């Protein structure tokens, strides 16, 4: 009923964590076996009529079953699968062997797998990357009464941009104008590849637009 109410209110994009491919593994990781069937049922039902992605973080507890977890998630009918190794496993997924059929079904998964195969760093800014976060103008992370630059910033206990109110968009624009991501340790060390690519593209397009106006 919780998800049905969200759908009635207009929510049509769901992201659900899935770090195992069976109930026993899930119990080992979470300590709760009973929640497994509920989570799987929710993913299946929501995927029938909504855009659903599952997020999988690989750690020492599940890294040996990476291929099984990805296939299991794909078979649930989700739109895409977002995989990210825990920090200590960046670019060390030697057991990664996901079929072309599954990769072609899920563009986000394919993007991340290609980055891993090509040895790209998945976290952290490089010297040629944008110093600005265009994502803050297009996305919103909220916890309680406060809004944050992004989910990562919130999880790393960064300071909120401000309170959620009628000034929220204005506050985020001010944050964007005054914030240098290279001077913020959270951004510098934790920004993900996909966010970095977005911000680099945003800066490039923004520069082109300004040139056309001259």
Task: Pin down the residues of each PLM region.
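Short alpha-helix within the catalytic core of nucleotide-sugar-dependent glycosyltransferases
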Residues: 3-4
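Structured C-terminal cap/extension of enzyme domains
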Residues: 183-189, 193
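Short, cationic low-complexity segments
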Residues: 214
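Radical SAM enzyme [4Fe-4S]-AdoMet core and its adjacent flexible, acidic
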Residues: 7-174, 183, 196-211
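C-terminal structured domain segments
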Residues: 177-179
